[in-house]
């Protein structure tokens, strides 16, 4: 005998957890493995930053699409009576907000500062905008950290919903 849940929407919940796990894994991989590796291996920090920025932009778009899809699925599960997914929607909404701020506010602003500096023949870190760029980078890093922690919490909560503690 197994203690595996056999609820009506068990497969949908498993798919939800699977997609969420892959997504959060990609966030962690990009932010805490790929980006640091780029800066550690490429000698030109400007190039490393541009490549990392492009990768983070793709990750932000993936986050936006997956987050919206998961919110739709969570709404469907709530409408089918799985009320525990109400709280999951709030986590997803916060993650969506993090991705949107990064993708539509911070990254374009930083790209603009970088392009402006390059048009003047210098890397952004040697331009008059270096301080602002560093501040924006710090804010973007903080938001990405919040999104990553929310993602870890999301997967933790989802795994508890599918595999509740047995007494």
Annotated model-derived regions:
Residues 2-68, 72-86, 112-130, 166:
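Interfacial loop at the N-terminal end of multi-pass membrane proteins
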Residues 7-20, 86-96, 151-160:
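Alpha-helical transmembrane segments and their helix-start/interface "positive-inside/aromatic belt" motifs
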Residues 18, 61, 65-68, 94, ...:
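Hydrophobic residues within alpha-helical transmembrane segments
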Residues 21-25, 91-107:
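Hydrophobic alpha-helical membrane-insertion segments
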Residues 34, 106, 151-154:
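Hydrophobic/aromatic residues in alpha-helical transmembrane segments
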Residues 55-56, 127-148:
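Individual transmembrane alpha-helices with interfacial aromatic-anchor signatures
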Residues 69-80, 143-165:
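Transmembrane alpha-helical segments in integral membrane proteins
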């Amino acid at each position: 005998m197994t203690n595996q849940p056999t609820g009506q929407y068990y497969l949908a919940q498993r798919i939800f957890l699977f997609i969420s796990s892959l997504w959060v894994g990609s966030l962690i991989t990009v932010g805490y493995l790929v980006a640091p590796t780029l800066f550690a291996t490429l000698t030109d920090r400007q190039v490393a930053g541009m490549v990392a920025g492009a990768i983070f932009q793709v990750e932000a778009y993936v986050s936006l699409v997956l987050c919206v899809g998961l919110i739709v699925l969570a709404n469907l599960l709530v409408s089918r009576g799985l009320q525990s997914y109400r709280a999951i929607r709030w986590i997803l909404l916060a993650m969506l907000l993090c991705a949107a701020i990064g993708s539509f506010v911070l990254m374009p602003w930083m790209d603009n500062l970088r392009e402006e500096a390059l048009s003047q023949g210098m890397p952004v870190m040697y331009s008059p905008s270096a301080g602002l760029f560093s501040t924006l980078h710090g804010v973007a890093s903080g938001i990405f950290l919040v999104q990553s922690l929310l993602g870890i919490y999301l997967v933790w909560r989802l795994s508890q919903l599918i595999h509740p503690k047995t007494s």
